[in-house]
Amino acid sequence: MLEQMGAAAKAASYKLALLSSREKNRVLEKIADYLEGQSEQILLANEQDLAEARANGLSDAMLDRLALNPARLKSIADDVRQVCNLADPVGQVIDGGLLDSGLRLERRRVPLGVVGVIYEARPNVTVDVASLCLKTGNAAILRGGKETWRTNAATVKVIQQALEECGLPAGAVQAIESPDRALVNEMLRMDKYIDMLIPRGGAGLHKLCREQSTIPVITGGIGVCHIVVDDSAEIEPALKIIVNAKTQRPSTCNTVETLLVHQDIADTFLPALSQQMAESGVTLHADPRALALLQDGPAKVEAVKSEQYDDEYLSLDLNVKVVADLDDAIAHIREHGTQHSDAILTRKLSHGNRFINEVDSSAVYVNASTRFTDGGQFGLGAEVAVSTQKLHARGPMGLEALTTYKWIGYGDDTIRA
């Protein structure tokens, strides 16, 4: 089955690579229209997925992530239309010039070819990834979470109908419908067809892909994010940033998980933090020095275990640790961070610059929330993932990250001397 899917995707990728921006936008507009016009079958499939998820005892938070309704589906369709408005990077000349040999050389952006994505149980990801891949002239093979396999299958069928209406092969966007986990292992070895693989899930999935895949893998999305409260931080602005970074959407990978508080500000800052976290419903997990300053406050607090510094909570839980100085804070981030997003709150320019230069994360912030690590917030439009590695992309992966480049030489019967 996967062999046939791979061959179909590769064949489709050659046709997609030749499309103009106008033609690709026409396809995306058609997909958006079809998602709205054929919403009933997608919503019916989603109801079946939700019923099975409830029977399996999934949490209310997870059920909310799985659920679609007419308003959410319209929002997803509108997101596809927004992709139409993004600049198409394909065909862009990055650089070039005339060489001494007389050869005119240029480096031009081109599609990757076939992109494989393994992702969690969020039905919107199916459409997001498909639209970004099509905009950049790539075919896509998608393997969504087993909790939404019916929703994903119904959504991809609608996308394929739109593709065929525009004269393009259905193989341009395909979904592995079976929830059989063995198919993931098979997908990881499809280097004959898939040019890049992006896993969007937990640490276990990322580890599996790194160890088993014969395809280049872009990993990321696991966010053990930190905020350092420097000794010069102003308490009220700092609390505002921390509340935003922790409570706006706790289940996202750019949510702060550990707070590192300078010892010289801890006595005044931590009681204020306790009050704010109590109002926000956040449970604090504190080291001994922080615990002594928090235990009489209104926030729920308990002693932190060392392994919790490596946890991506994705919930209203926050580690709090008192550090001796900026060196101590940076050392902690180097040991426990995931190179996703880290921030410092300071009024000392020198400390901000040190943090920028010494914390090796895909996004670092000075006096700002970690929640900004997002394709839309960065002005990239939608994103296919957030990469925490250094090759081939880093940070939010927008359209440009779904391209590579080729060297093109124009000669006049030119030969090498």
Swiss-Prot record:
Function: Catalyzes the NADPH-dependent reduction of L-glutamate 5-phosphate into L-glutamate 5-semialdehyde and phosphate. The product spontaneously undergoes cyclization to form 1-pyrroline-5-carboxylate.
Gene3D superfamilies named in the record: Aldehyde Dehydrogenase, Chain A, domain 1 (3.40.605.10), Aldehyde Dehydrogenase, Chain A, domain 2 (3.40.309.10)
GO BP terms: L-proline biosynthetic process
EC code: 1.2.1.41
Protein name stated in the entry: Gamma-glutamyl phosphate reductase
Principal subcellular localisation of the protein: cytoplasm
Pathway: Amino-acid biosynthesis; L-proline biosynthesis; L-glutamate 5-semialdehyde from L-glutamate: step 2/2
GO cellular component: cytoplasm
Signal sequence segment: none
InterPro entries linked: Ald_DH/histidinol_DH (IPR016161), Ald_DH_C (IPR016163), Ald_DH_N (IPR016162), Aldehyde_DH_dom (IPR015590), G-glutamylP_reductase_CS (IPR020593), Glu-5-SA_DH (IPR012134), GPR_dom (IPR000965)
Location of the protein in the cell: Cytoplasm
